[in-house]
Each structure stands twice: as structure tokens, then as C-alpha cells.
């Protein structure tokens, strides 16, 4: 049986990979969706979240996915209270309930709205749900593409702990982190991990964007502290949400910036277009008439392909990034 290896802290777990039909090239595939967290009043979900869930299920059936990456703001507007909070059932389990999704693991990180509630409860829910994987505020995943020696590392961050909280519905920069020591510890951990990473693809994921032309714009804290690490250590891509639209940007070092924050709301704002360096923006979609969307990522021995999918089923944009050169 094909398998992948996942490293959560010091724990190594072997998990089965889905078989992708008769695909000629073995791949690792996943869906990345952010800001999908419904609403705090009945029915605890939105039409956009439901549409995204339906299209994610269809995409999993037709294109394949080994897991789903949640990019934060999992429960609007103030997170959850405890691990038995009904929002887990009403905003997550009951929405992403299609048969195609029942055995697909989710790897989760926290957004600013999650931090207005109890993030520890979201971590604890990992012991309750067979799908929900959130082992700690920040952690490492490692995958091996079946029948190859190609490896993928993903570093899941807590950017709220790094930079502080902010208002998701106002153009605010994050305030200072609540605990500077905790922020420095996470950044130091990431730096050491990236310096040691030998994988063929290295991805970093967090809630806040580094670059964005939309309502919140570039996150200055991350431009200062995280962006240099991506360039120095040859990171393939940074995935995020926070702004409620879909964007793809790429810098002069070849780092891709995948913004997928259209799981529950859509915002057409491009108010920070001039705050992003010329030539970085390759794609933006924020139509208020849209039901939102997400990204589908496929990693092969040759390249990483990213497709932006609207909840209606339409493919909006496709791009690819090369495998990192071997040392």
C-alpha cells in the first residue's frame, strides 16, 4: 500500500495515501481553504461555506486529495469555547459531510478569529474527530510521494502568536504579539527547521498574508520577519488566508504566495495594490457575486501545480512552481 509519513513534533505516523486511479505520475494532492468558519448564529454556516464544501467534495472525487489544509478563521466570529462546542458539529462536521470527504484528514492552523476564542479547544478536538488534526499551535508535516524518493515538508504556523491579533473586517495591521518570548520561540523554531530542511518541496502556511493587494494588505510583521526566511532557505510557497478572496503572487526569488481566503465571504477590495511590489501579482479574484473558492495543489516529482477553483466549479487560474534543486 502506498503511504505517506507525517511528522508531528517528534512523532512519526505512517498514513495511507489515496490511489489516484491510473494517473501516470505519482503525486501528493491537497485542497487549501481559508476563512471558511460559518457564522455564530443558526444555521451556523453560510451559503458560500456550503457551496465550497460541495465543490471541495466534487474536486476530491475528480482530481483527488490526500488531505485538506485549513488556513485559519475556522469558526467565526469568536472561535469556540471548549472541545465540546456545538460549532464543531454545526460549522465543520455537518457541512463537510459528503461521502467523498468523510475519510480525508484536515490539517488545521488558527486565525485571528480563532484566537478570540479558545484555540486550545481546537487542538483538543483532534482527540475527538478522526478528521481534525491540530496537534499544537505550530507544527511540521512531512510527506513522501508514493513510489518515489520525492519529499514534501509543510510548516504550519500560528501567525497571530507571531504578530498579534487584528480585526478581520477592518484594514488593521496586527497589534504586537501578546507574548514576545513565545513569538521569538516560534520564529526561532521555524528558522532552525528551514535551515535543516532537505525536502524537495518546502511549504510554509499561516493565516496572515505576507503579500496581499486586498483589504488588509501586506502584513508588515511577516514582511519583516518571515519573508527573508523564505528567500534564504529556498521555500517553494507560502499559503495563507485572512483576506477574503483568491490571489496568487510570486516574488523575484521565485517564492509563490498562495492566498486562499474565500471559504465563507468574498471581498472585492484591492485597496493595497500599490503596497505590493510591481510584478508580484499574477492573479486576483474577489467578485462579490461569487460563492467563493479554494485552491487545489498537486505535487509531482517535477513541479507543484496550483489551481484556483471557484465554488461554482469553474477553474479560475493555474500556475506551477518547480521542485527545489537538490544540494
Curated annotation (Swiss-Prot):
Fe cation 2 binds at residues 73, 112, 207, 242. It catalyses: a phosphate monoester + H2O = an alcohol + phosphate. Fe cation 1 binds at residues 35, 73, 76, 244. The keyword rRNA-binding does not apply. GO terms for cellular component: lysosome. InterPro entries: Acid_PPase, Calcineurin-like_PHP_ApaH, Metallo-depent_PP-like, Metallophosphoesterase_PAP. One of its GO terms (molecular function) is ferric iron binding. Its EC number is 3.1.3.2. It holds the Pfam family Metallophos. It is found in: Lysosome. Disulfide bonds join 163-221. Its main location: other. Residues 1-22 form the signal peptide. May play a role in the process of bone resorption. The osteoclastic trap acts on nucleotide tri- and diphosphates with higher affinity, compared with other substrates. This is Tartrate-resistant acid phosphatase type 5. The gene is Acp5.
Amino acid at each position: 500500500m502506498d503511504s505517506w509519513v507525517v511528522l508531528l513534533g517528534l512523532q512519526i505516523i505512517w498514513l495511507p495515501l489515496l490511489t489516484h486511479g491510473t494517473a501516470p505520475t505519482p503525486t501528493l494532492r491537497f485542497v487549501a481553504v481559508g476563512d471558511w468558519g460559518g457564522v455564530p448564529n443558526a444555521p451556523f454556516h453560510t451559503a458560500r461555506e456550503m457551496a465550497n464544501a460541495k465543490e471541495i467534495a466534487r474536486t476530491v472525487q475528480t482530481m483527488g486529495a490526500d488531505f485538506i489544509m485549513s488556513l485559519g478563521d475556522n469558526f467565526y466570529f469568536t472561535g469556540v469555547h471548549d472541545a465540546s462546542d456545538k460549532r464543531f458539529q454545526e460549522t465543520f462536521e455537518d457541512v463537510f459531510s459528503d461521502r467523498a470527504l468523510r475519510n480525508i484528514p484536515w490539517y488545521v492552523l488558527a486565525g485571528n478569529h480563532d484566537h478570540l476564542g479558545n484555540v486550545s479547544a481546537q487542538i483538543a478536538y483532534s482527540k475527538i474527530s478522526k478528521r481534525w488534526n491540530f496537534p499544537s499551535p505550530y507544527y511540521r508535516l512531512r510527506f513522501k510521494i508514493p513510489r518515489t524518493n520525492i519529499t514534501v515538508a509543510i510548516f504550519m504556523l500560528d501567525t497571530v502568536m507571531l504578530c498579534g491579533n487584528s480585526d478581520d473586517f477592518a484594514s488593521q495591521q496586527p497589534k504586537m504579539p501578546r507574548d514576545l518570548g513565545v513569538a521569538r520561540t516560534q520564529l526561532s523554531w521555524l528558522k532552525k527547521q528551514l535551515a535543516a530542511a532537505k525536502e524537495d518541496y518546502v511549504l510554509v502556511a499561516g493565516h496572515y498574508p505576507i503579500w496581499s493587494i486586498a483589504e488588509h494588505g501586506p502584513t508588515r510583521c511577516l514582511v519583516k520577519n518571515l519573508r527573508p526566511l523564505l528567500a534564504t532557505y529556498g521555500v517553494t510557497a507560502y499559503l495563507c488566508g485572512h483576506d477574503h478572496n483568491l490571489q496568487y503572487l510570486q516574488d523575484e526569488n521565485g517564492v509563490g504566495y498562495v492566498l486562499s481566503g474565500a471559504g465563507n465571504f468574498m471581498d472585492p477590495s484591492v485597496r493595497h495594490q500599490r503596497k505590493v511590489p510591481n510584478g508580484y501579482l499574477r492573479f486576483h479574484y474577489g467578485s462579490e457575486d461569487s460563492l467563493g473558492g479554494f485552491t487545489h495543489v498537486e505535487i509531482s516529482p517535477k513541479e507543484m501545480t496550483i489551481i484556483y477553483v471557484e465554488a461554482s466549479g469553474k477553474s479560475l487560474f493555474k500556475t506551477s512552481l518547480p521542485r527545489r534543486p537538490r544540494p
